[in-house]
Amino acid sequence: YDFVMSTNFSPIVAKICYKHNIKYLAWIYDAPINSDRLEFYRFPTSYLFLFDRIEAERLIGMECKNIFHLPLATNPKRLSSIHISEADKKTYSCDLSFIGKFYDNQLTQIMSIQNDYYKGYINAILDTQLKVYGYNFIEEMITDDLIDILNQQLHICGVSGTLTKRAVIFTIAEQVTYTERVALLNLFGQFCNVHYYSNKQPESLSHIAYQGTAYYFSEMPKVFRLSKLNLN
């Protein structure tokens, strides 16, 4: 093969391509991406294309050389050919839609076995990051000493496994995303008709019309077209 290509990033594929000296191209549409996989991103055979320019610059600054910014593409010809019926208009029309999931589990598990001091420390990071837009300082606040303490508490409670610094940073960033999404959807839900599509209905949402899942090729384009605004 000249190269192997995937949407999003697969560490297993990256490792195999590195072993056989084959270029691996990953077109990534999620953000933030998992920084716990840095060793795979740094393979000379790995080429990552990210739609998020800030994420791309961040990884380049972490000695990942083959990182490129590539805006998300679409196929207007295919999308414009999709028929919209009267039934579709009744089902999908709304003021605002959101398709996606909430990251609300991992940090809760970590926090549940920490003492009040470190719960407060992590909550302070979350609260402060939520008030600052355009600069991510989570990484600066998560020290090696803190990771050691968190792992000690895990082992005291009989939890197997070890937390890495990158995993904790990523988990906190996910929690920030979760909190922002819940706040925005609940705010908009007070003033307009909001449809939420996902495989699970969060208990933290109110005044929101939960619609279940939306299939990528048949339903999602209709959701986008019939929403006055789509929240990403």
Question: Could you describe each region identified by the protein language model?
Answer:
Residues 1-61, 78-84, 210-230:
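Extended catalytic core of nucleotide-activated donor transferases of GT-like folds
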Residues 62-232:
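Nucleotide-sugar donor-binding catalytic core of glycosyltransferases
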